[in-house]
Amino acid sequence: MKRFHVHLAVDDPAANVRFYSTVFGVPPTVQKPDYAKWMLEDPRVNFAISSRGLTAGVDHLGFQVDSDAELTELRAAVAAAEIDALDQAEAACCYARGDKAWSVDPQGLRWETFLTHGAHTVYGEDPVQEPVPTAQTRCGCGG
């Protein structure tokens, strides 16, 4: 089953953790000094914040999937829309590791489709602060 993903770039992670924990009624599932993630069930959202973005606000949107088949399906949908994508196997980002595909919609909004395989000890790096495929390495992911 797919889970919608929202990643916000924030200037003050601690203040935002307090705010979103109050709004969501639960603490983050993962919390680090520069990153926090809530795996919400109602609505089914992977909501993440980090201080790693270029500017405060929506860093990117995406879909977290539960299987290789779902990742392949969404990657095919992006290709059918004639949007370039950057595929990554065993990417390390947002204290997680997994397979993912990055794309940029016609408006310039970055989209991440990913399958998480497990935790990672460091924030890591991923591409796509610029349009695909000329992206520079930088992380802003869902983990």
Model-identified regions with their sequence ranges:
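N-terminal beta-strand motif that seeds the catalytic metal site of vicinal oxygen chelate
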Residues: 1-14, 44, 60-61, 122-143
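Core segments of cupin and vicinal oxygen chelate
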Residues: 2-46
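Vicinal oxygen chelate
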Residues: 13-14, 62-110, 118-121
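A short linear hydrophobic-aromatic micro-motif
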Residues: 27, 46-48, 84-89
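Short acidic/glycine-enriched loop/turn segments that link adjacent beta-strands
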Residues: 32-35, 55-57, 94-99
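Short secondary-structure transition/capping segments
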Residues: 41-42, 98-101, 128-129
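Short, charged/polar surface micro-motifs in flexible loops or helix N-caps
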Residues: 41-46, 54-56, 66-71
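Residue-level structural signal for beta-strand termini and adjacent loop
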Residues: 51, 114-116
